[in-house]
């Protein structure tokens, strides 16, 4: 069974978006900016809050982790916590405090974070900070941004993430330095892939046009390095499945469909059931106003899924969350001079609707 399996990989894990390389290509300016601010901790000072924004796959997470890894080589006094902040304020707080998720109130959890911060200066990296802000994350930022020993580093795909903060008290205390990441260009993506290829693959197993093609296709997807890495990884999987000793251009083109399916699977996996049903309502109605979606959601919930109806306010919040995940698009349509605007919700134009509907059906 395994004897005939081609040995293409030296280390497949290198192609994972979770892998943090020893050096970074084409992000020297951003590395310099982040390290300049966080470096104040080496002088005994609390670094200023940071907000790092840019499109998906632009290197925000890997660059921040790289700087953090380097910082930890120079200090043992700092308390550094990295979390994906995609839950409620309470859930995010328990992750930061490393506390159990039951039995303690929110303010008790905040007090435990204060205790951790009292051990030294504390840097809290909150990846996908927009996700918790779309829920009740203001509440947590209110407390953390007022702690003299705490530096918050927020990462977001949403350029207007600060507009999500509705509490004026938070706005006055959380005034981050902003660092923006531009999408990668095709040459930059090619450089990133070539660096990883040396560590990931055995010699001579990629045809010459494989890396340039992956880079070009990813550049068309808003310069998404994760997409480029997924394409290369999936193309190699296809070659192995077909018992080929070399990855070809045709494998890359076949991989585009598999990467799309995997993206949809991951997207659905992170949703709660009410979000899945709401997305299903948007997809099957081909869009509509929030009121129209609201009626369809409640009808579907009662007739097909046996769940509970939502208030229109809660549904609007869920629609905003789906927009943050890149699964729906919310268009603002004018009603004429002096008559205000309407929302119009449509499925994301970048996602295959049939694949998405099938994935939702399987998950419910």
Swiss-Prot record:
Alphabetized InterPro entries for the sequence: AAA+_ATPase, AAA_22, Cdc6_C, Cdc6_lid, ORC1/CDC6, Orc1/Cdc6_arc, P-loop_NTPase, WH-like_DNA-bd_sf
Coiled coil: none
Keyword Membrane: no
Keywords: ATP-binding, DNA replication, Nucleotide-binding, Plasmid
Stored PANTHER family: CELL DIVISION CONTROL PROTEIN 6-RELATED, ORC1-TYPE DNA REPLICATION PROTEIN
Protein task: Involved in regulation of DNA replication.
Protein name from the UniProt record: ORC1-type DNA replication protein
Organism of provenance: Methanothermobacter thermautotrophicus (Methanobacterium thermoformicicum)
